[in-house]
């Protein structure tokens, strides 16, 4: 990636179809796991996002998931969706860089390789804000369901800010902030009979 050039994750990885070699795996849709072609690509884009942060590159487009993910620290994920959501960054360094990624069973690694003059002398990636968004319990009635009572567990949301601070030996400095708003999901309890609803 030459100096001043932009990297697009979606453009680089191409259409996530079976014809292009992508397999079906779980994908997160509206906060729920569902099977889809290319499931798991967000783990690669999130790992790349963290490598970009540590290399001191400039992130130009990044979106968090609907809910926090387990494979990167809170606020340091980058979701992608073909034709809708991309992860992009720019090489604003003095020299070109290479993006090298490697897969091994159970792990993904991404390196940003380049000129030693562009290697930061100081990097700090830290949370500057973490707020909890509460969730509610919602009771409903559905006479058509088989179960007497069905519960869909919810979870709290999070509002997080992560700061990227980078310094180079020649005096250059770079800072950026990344906001992540993870939605709260209400617990929904559905009863077959209206008479079973809890009394308020």
Predicted features along the sequence, with ranges:
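Well-ordered beta-sheet/strand-loop patches within structured domains
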Residues: 1-200
């Amino acid at each position: 990636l030459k100096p001043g050039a932009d990297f697009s994750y979606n453009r680089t990885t191409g259409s996530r179809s079976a014809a292009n070699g992508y397999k079906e795996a779980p994908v997160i849709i509206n906060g729920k796991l569902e099977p889809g072609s290319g499931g798991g690509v967000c783990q690669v884009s999130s790992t790349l996002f963290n490598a970009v942060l540590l290399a001191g590159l400039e992130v130009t487009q990044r979106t968090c998931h609907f809910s926090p993910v387990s494979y990167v620290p809170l606020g340091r994920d980058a979701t992608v969706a073909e034709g809708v959501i991309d992860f992009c960054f720019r090489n604003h360094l003095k020299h070109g860089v290479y993006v090298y990624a490697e897969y091994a069973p159970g792990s993904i690694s991404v390196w940003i390789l380049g000129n030693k003059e562009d290697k930061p002398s100081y990097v700090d990636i830290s949370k500057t804000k973490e707020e909890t968004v509460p969730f509610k319990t919602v009771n409903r009635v559905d006479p058509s369901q088989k179960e007497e009572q069905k519960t869909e567990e919810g979870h709290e949301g999070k509002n997080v800010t992560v700061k990227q601070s980078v310094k180079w030996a020649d005096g250059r400095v770079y800072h950026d902030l990344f906001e992540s708003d993870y939605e709260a999901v209400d617990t929904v309890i559905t009863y077959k009979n209206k008479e079973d609803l809890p009394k308020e």
